[in-house]
């Protein structure tokens, strides 16, 4: 842009421009505003919220078709939502959960389905224990510095699972565990990245659990309120339908241009969008090579979120809570949770279509997807009432051009160790937020808040308002949602793996011994 072409920026000058009006960008803007910093938030969509989105209509009152869940140890989002006057409620797991595998339904209670096969039990136990132990070796703020980083980053999670698991039962559930947690396939993701991801969410039990875990609660009225209320506080500082296309930081201030040719001048910029979406922006000067390479190598996960509404919560007649873990290649849905309103109205089941299945099911008409889901629920829950919904909502995040997918970006093999260290590294006066840059609960709303507030403090430090030592701040535990420590029994800590047991004793002796041990701890029926 020549001097003759420079736009008139009268009334368009700000201290900090924020790209992205999701929770991360708005959390950053809110914190900066509290320091009397003049901010501008540019959001590409016609709404705020990013990967959180609360739909409102007469059929559902409100429903979260994007990010929704919060729980213990997610203290930043709990603090922010409380400050905004948004209450939480517990997701219902009072009744039994069910596992559907090999065409049969098995009710259970707890975080993970029980395992009746002695060797499979040993295999499961070793899987969770090994993943957690490996995760503890990985620094949450610098996973590329882990002692085995190079080795683990060359492996896919499929490679690692196949190496750890001895039984097909444990192996297939482990594949599903990857699908559910990061909406991608085990062969697509780096073992180092996935182990880090689970670790920074508190471990295998915390990330997968409802009670005392990442899915314990939702917001009354929907998670979209977090962004909507911050937008209300910021007023006209939030510009919707303003995709950023150009950033020029060659002069004293940064020039930001949007798709509709609006121009703004800022001292600093915070990018709070998924890394791969910054490839839609033209930068002057060009991004450093490592940053440019990184953003081309972080694809987004794939998910369709589906809510089926019923006249009544018929599943409770069988003492089921609505949570289903479904292991069936032909089934569209992999996992469900009760999505009934906290007052018991509008009974609903939320289900995720994940990874490869999201691509497959997206090719079908919405009505066919709905029918297939209802038929699946009828089969798993053993009730024809599942065939007669009163309403259906869904959101295919793969078709969102300003998200690219959900829940989060993932690291394929080799990328974390080669380029991961630049994910939060500023480029000149451009800083980076977004849940992908977090070190606790990355991929969740909690990670979005952590990243946004950290990036805001980096800018405040550059402005001389915050000391460098105060950029990273520990968050006090929520008094309203305290965490319960996750512990493991002596046997869980010390039982051998299947190969370990077979190495010590003969096969027949091993099976007999294991059956006796499991009988004693009441893992097997009398």
Curated annotation (Swiss-Prot):
Which GO biological-process labels does this protein carry?
A: catecholamine catabolic process; dopamine catabolic process; phenylethylamine metabolic process; positive regulation of signal transduction; serotonin metabolic process
Coiled-coil region = none
Q: Does the keyword Flavoprotein apply?
A: yes
> According to its record, how does it sit in the membrane?
Single-pass type IV membrane protein
Annotated catalysed reactions: a secondary aliphatic amine + O2 + H2O = a primary amine + an aldehyde + H2O2; a primary methyl amine + O2 + H2O = an aldehyde + H2O2 + NH4(+); (R)-adrenaline + O2 + H2O = (R)-3,4-dihydroxymandelaldehyde + methylamine + H2O2; dopamine + O2 + H2O = 3,4-dihydroxyphenylacetaldehyde + H2O2 + NH4(+)
- What are the GO MF terms of this UniProt record? flavin adenine dinucleotide binding; monoamine oxidase activity; primary methylamine oxidase activity; serotonin binding
Assembly and partners are described as:
Monomer, homo- or heterodimer (containing two subunits of similar size). Each subunit contains a covalently bound flavin. Enzymatically active as monomer.
- What this protein is called in its record is Amine oxidase [flavin-containing] A
């Amino acid at each position: 842009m020549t001097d003759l072409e420079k736009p008139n920026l009268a009334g368009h000058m700000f201290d900090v421009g924020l790209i992205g009006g999701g929770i991360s960008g708005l959390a950053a803007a809110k914190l900066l505003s509290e320091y009397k910093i003049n901010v501008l938030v540019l959001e590409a969509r016609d709404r705020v919220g990013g990967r959180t989105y609360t739909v409102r209509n007469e059929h559902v009152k409100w429903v979260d078709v994007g990010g929704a869940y919060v729980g213990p140890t997610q203290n930043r989002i709990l603090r922010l939502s409380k400050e905004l006057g948004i209450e939480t409620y517990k997701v219902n797991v009072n009744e039994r959960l069910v596992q559907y595998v090999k065409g049969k339904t098995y009710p259970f209670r707890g975080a993970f389905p029980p395992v009746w096969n002695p060797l499979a039990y040993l295999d499961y136990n070793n899987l969770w224990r090994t993943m957690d132990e490996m995760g503890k070796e990985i620094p949450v703020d610098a996973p590329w510095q882990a002692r085995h980083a190079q080795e683990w980053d060359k492996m896919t999670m499929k490679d690692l699972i196949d190496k750890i698991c001895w039984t097909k039962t444990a192996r297939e559930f482990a594949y599903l565990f990857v699908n559910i947690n990061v909406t991608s396939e085990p062969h697509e993701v780096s073992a180092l990245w996935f182990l880090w991801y689970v670790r920074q969410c508190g471990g295998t039990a915390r990330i997968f659990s409802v009670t005392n875990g990442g899915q314990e609660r939702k917001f009354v009225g929907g998670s979209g309120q977090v962004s909507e209320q911050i937008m209300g506080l910021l007023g006209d500082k939030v510009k919707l339908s303003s995709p950023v296309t150009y950033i020029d930081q060659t002069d004293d201030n940064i020039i930001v241009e949007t798709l509709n040719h609006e121009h703004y001048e800022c001292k600093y910029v915070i990018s709070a969008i998924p890394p791969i979406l910054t490839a839609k922006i033209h930068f002057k000067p060009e991004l450093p090579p490592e940053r440019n390479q990184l953003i081309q190598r972080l694809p987004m996960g794939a998910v369709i979120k589906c809510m089926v509404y019923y006249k009544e919560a018929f599943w409770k007649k069988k003492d089921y809570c609505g949570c289903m873990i479904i292991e069936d290649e032909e089934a569209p849905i992999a996992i469900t949770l009760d999505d009934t309103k906290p007052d018991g109205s509008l009974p609903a089941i939320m289900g995720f279509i994940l990874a490869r299945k999201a691509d497959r099911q997206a090719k079908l008409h919405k009505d066919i997807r709905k029918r297939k889901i209802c038929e699946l629920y009828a089969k798993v829950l053993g009730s024809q009432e599942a065939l007669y919904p009163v309403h259906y909502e869904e959101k295919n995040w793969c078709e969102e051009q300003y998200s690219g997918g959900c829940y989060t970006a993932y690291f394929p093999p080799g990328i974390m160790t080669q380029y991961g260290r630049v994910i939060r590294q500023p480029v000149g006066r451009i800083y980076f937020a977004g849940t992908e840059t977090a070190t606790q609960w990355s991929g969740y709303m909690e990670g979005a808040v952590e990243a946004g507030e950290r990036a805001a403090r980096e800018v405040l430090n550059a402005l001389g308002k915050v000391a460098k030592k105060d950029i990273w701040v520990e968050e006090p535990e929520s008094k309203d949602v305290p965490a319960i420590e996750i512990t493991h029994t002596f046997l869980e800590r010390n039982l051998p793996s299947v190969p370990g047991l077979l190495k010590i004793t003969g096969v027949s002796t091993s099976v007999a011994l294991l059956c006796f041990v499991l009988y004693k701890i009441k893992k097997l029926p009398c």
